Amino acid sequence: ILSGVSFLAPSNIIAQEVHGRQASSQQERISFRVVSWNIENLFDTHHDSLKNDHEYLPDAIRHWNYSRYKKKLADVARVITAIGEWNPPALVGLCEVENDTVLRDLTRRSPLKELSYRYVMTNSPDLRGIDVALLY
């Protein structure tokens, strides 16, 4: 048996708390969170020749440098952790991530490393080079 409560978190994050019961004689209650978030252009600072990522390079219009990139990783990690309250979200869907490098940095080189998330991601044909990913 599953039931859920949706709520909007900061900005464009949708979180779903799911409750259920195991099919056992004890009827133990299970609760977990599922989050979907458009993190809006999580790009690293390196040019990918197969993608149109010029806007997010250090010498480009956004002046996207390593310190801004690291701050965005830390901010994303902080919000994901805060959404989970005492229990981190079981699943986190992320929109607009550039590549495997940013996901590896987010899950292994930010405060999220403590939560041991793994991930899968798409390789979309989007010309800007943005993909979607799932942390689990």
Regions found by a protein language model. Name each.
Residues 1-18:
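Bacterial Sec-dependent N-terminal signal peptides
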Residues 13-132:
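N-terminal, active-site-proximal structural segment of metallo-dependent hydrolase catalytic domains
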